């Protein structure tokens, strides 16, 4: 390592986040920030990429990067194999957290809340617009389970391709969407000298309350 970890840092130079810029509820601000990210961030950064954290039945946390695939006034939707590790975690503990980080904008959004499955129709609607290879992969891959090697996975894919050679694959029952229903959303804007802006929204008795947190 050529540089000490203790010396690795960047200075944040963009404008701050004032209460006057923040609406009374968080979804409008998220939509605004997300639109900024779509316009500003460039590959390899994906604007809809986020880290999802779940907790298993033994209380151990796990995190991984996923893609946000739908957003409405109810919450934030992602799709996965329901039998995967994350699916098992959510079945045991339906609370999760997600974090979006947009480095070009020096912004981060943290979201916490309860997770629920979306409807079968919502899952099927999204499944049908995925590329064919991804639709076949949802059938072929025993996600999160141990396999012998890459050849085993490729064999499963070939068998799935043969199975659906004469018909279009339909959405498997073991695959679909989850929606995180937010109870807390924090907007973080990097500022100079690590004196960052943090505006936190909490859902209290069905109403959003906004507050500033110390950096």
UniProtKB/Swiss-Prot annotation:
Alphabetized PANTHER family for the sequence: PYRIDOXINE-5'-PHOSPHATE OXIDASE (PTHR10851:SF0), PYRIDOXINE-5-PHOSPHATE OXIDASE (PTHR10851)
EC number(s) stated in the UniProt entry for this protein: 1.4.3.5
One Pfam family, short name: PNPOx_N
Catalytic class of the enzyme: oxidoreductase
Cofactor(s), names only, from the UniProt record: FMN
Keyword Metal-binding: no
Biochemical pathway: Cofactor metabolism; pyridoxal 5'-phosphate salvage; pyridoxal 5'-phosphate from pyridoxamine 5'-phosphate: step 1/1; Cofactor metabolism; pyridoxal 5'-phosphate salvage; pyridoxal 5'-phosphate from pyridoxine 5'-phosphate: step 1/1
GO BP terms: pyridoxine biosynthetic process
Protein family membership: Belongs to the pyridoxamine 5'-phosphate oxidase family.
PROSITE patterns per UniProt: PYRIDOX_OXIDASE
Assembly, per entry: Homodimer.
Keywords, ordered alphabetically: Flavoprotein, FMN, Oxidoreductase, Pyridoxine biosynthesis
Cofactor: binding details: Binds 1 FMN per subunit.
Residues annotated as binding FMN: 64-69, 79-80, 86, 108, 143-144, 188, 198
One MF annotation (Gene Ontology) recorded for this entry: pyridoxamine phosphate oxidase activity
Record: residues binding substrate: 9-12, 69, 126, 130, 134, 194-196
Organism this protein belongs to: Pseudomonas entomophila (strain L48)
Function: Catalyzes the oxidation of either pyridoxine 5'-phosphate (PNP) or pyridoxamine 5'-phosphate (PMP) into pyridoxal 5'-phosphate (PLP).
Identification of the protein by name: Pyridoxine/pyridoxamine 5'-phosphate oxidase
Keyword Flavoprotein annotated: yes
